[in-house]
Amino acid sequence: MTAGHRRAKHINHNLIEACALNGWAMGVGSQRRELTDPKAAFEWQHLRRDFPEVSLYSNLGIAQLITNPLSDIQRLTDALQANALIIHCNPLQECMQPEGTTHYKGCWQALADVVKNLPLPIIIKETGCGFSRETMMRLNEIGIAAIDVGGLGGTHWGRIEGHRATHDPIRQQAAITFQNWGIDTATSVRHAAELKPSFEIWGSGGVLNGLNAA
């Protein structure tokens, strides 16, 4: 997915059309803006209207899950007629963003509450740094439906924020320092499988060739 620019609607239409042809699901971009501006939902509503048969997943950051009531989360998923909710965990990116939200206290309770009370599968996703064994063990105890490990080696949002910080040399240097920080996708997938969890294991990004896969 993509969002926030003039070609986003066209690109997302092509992506969901590919999903419809191949029987794939599609996760939308972060719905954070919709929490304060319901009109922002227009960016995604045409996808559901034009492709009602595709499984569409809502998407929100864990910081917003902590600071917003469940009723607001439900409003986002209802507006999309979502089939699942992705909670993305991106602490490195948030630390690098000038506008980032770095409040994570209460995240475990917020996750447990949404799993218990929202009538949709909950998917937890990293954004380029992978998950540790300990984190995945705890997520398994909470009862999430799937983990997308989103490990090191693919798109790395910490690096992207460093490139955005053209007038902030401290953030640029921090992005360089952390550019290889994280657990690679293949290792995260292997660690998850060793837990024999109840959740599905998804691996996105960082598997670039047959050697990585092996």
Where are these regions (language model features)?
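Active-site entrance/lid segments in N-terminal catalytic domains of soluble metabolic enzymes
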Residues: 1-137
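Residue-identity detector for glycine
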Residues: 4, 23, 27-29, 61, ...
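Residue-level recognition of conserved structural "scaffold" positions that shape functional pockets
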Residues: 34-36, 160, 212-213
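Catalytic cores of alpha/beta
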Residues: 67-76, 129-149, 188-197, 201-203, ...
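Glycine/Thr-rich beta-alpha phosphate-binding loop at enzyme active sites
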Residues: 82-109, 135-192
